[in-house]
Amino acid sequence: KNDKNILPLKRGSKIALFGASAYKSIAGGTGSSNVNKEYIVDISDGLVQAGYNISPLAAAYYEKYNKAQELLLDPQPDCPEWQRVSYHRVVVPEPDLSGATVFINREAEACEAAVVVLARKSGETSDRRVDDDFNLTAAEKTMIERVCEAFHREGKPVVVVMNVCGTVETASWSALPDAIVMAWFPGQEC
């Protein structure tokens, strides 16, 4: 989807980048659908390398959130690296932004556009589900709704990037953003 041909966004634009997976992108699935990668260029880093300016407010928020989630989700503090959340790049649950009106409004005032990243991961031993997988989670729906509301009020576009392994229900929310991009599992450079 690319309403009013808003894509590509103008290089040098200041972007508010929402979504935990924007800063910890998913390069591949699990089991044989995983890729052995020397490094991963996350969506946030890829946008910077392409000449966009990422809002430091959103970046700081999600970097702290992702670190906290890794601590909560790791099986035990002294587990081997290959068992850690950071090694497997799990999709952490999105934070509930329903009470983050001031944060989102500040970003809408300060930035030229918003990019919201949604992610899914699947593969051997981790089949997908209908609830909170094919369908968005309540937190993801809230994030899209709040970001679209704030940025559209300022006359600014919103792009949703889907870093996913398969189909995701879009009919219930696709009218909200100005553009939807399917990134799929891009390999090591998102």
Q: Model segments located where?
A:
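C-terminal non-catalytic regions of proteins with extracellular/luminal or membrane-system context
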Residues: 1-190
